[in-house]
Amino acid sequence: SMGPRAGEEPDLLLRDFYAASALPAGDYSAARSFMTEEAAGDWDPDQQVLIVDSLDIITDAEADSTEGGRSFNVRGSVIGTLSEGGSYSSENGDFEAQIHMTQVDGEWRISDLPQVVVIERTELRNRYQPHSLFFYEHTGQALESDRRWLSTGQESLDTELITLLLQGPAEELAPATMSVVPREANFGGIEDGVYHFTGMSDMSQEDRTRFAAELVWTLSTAGIPGPYQVVADDAPLVEGLDEL
């Protein structure tokens, strides 16, 4: 895991903190390990992640006089954002923040920071991977791909992809797609290699077949090998098909 190194200088510690911010596992536990206990408990970052080209870290000497702490101004050009579901949107803007650090048992820790996750473009490329979700376009004739950036440190990629599939397409894609899955549909997990769903008993055979296609395309494109055994409400998702 990525945590602070003993005796690390505050500016280098801050660099490592921003590298650790590209690891969302455990509600950003790696990034929180660079903060004081109080700051880590109070940090409730916005769901939207900011992507910057690179970060400049400048010592703020004027603010440094306070009780032996250190202050830094952090700046970068915002190039995009990642939604909670991993949808990337291009943006143009500036990120600017002041970070305060203090010593805890002789080690520098971040004591004050903005409520936002900021990662550099290179960290996005190193720590995230683009995957495609597939949804039917509104006529129900063809599949549309919906690109998502997902953290490569995830335990089970298939579970994450299926969860996102049930949540539906990205906002800008939604009007052009058809919804084949009812709101009450739920993914119950994978048991002995079988994908279990509930809340699908009211779906037509046509919609079941469409959801099966969305699922197969999403999993196979992500490199998850088939065939897939898919059960909905204790029966095969598509009647007569034990495997997709």
Region locations from a protein language model:
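Bimodal "functional hotspot" detector
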Residues: 1-244
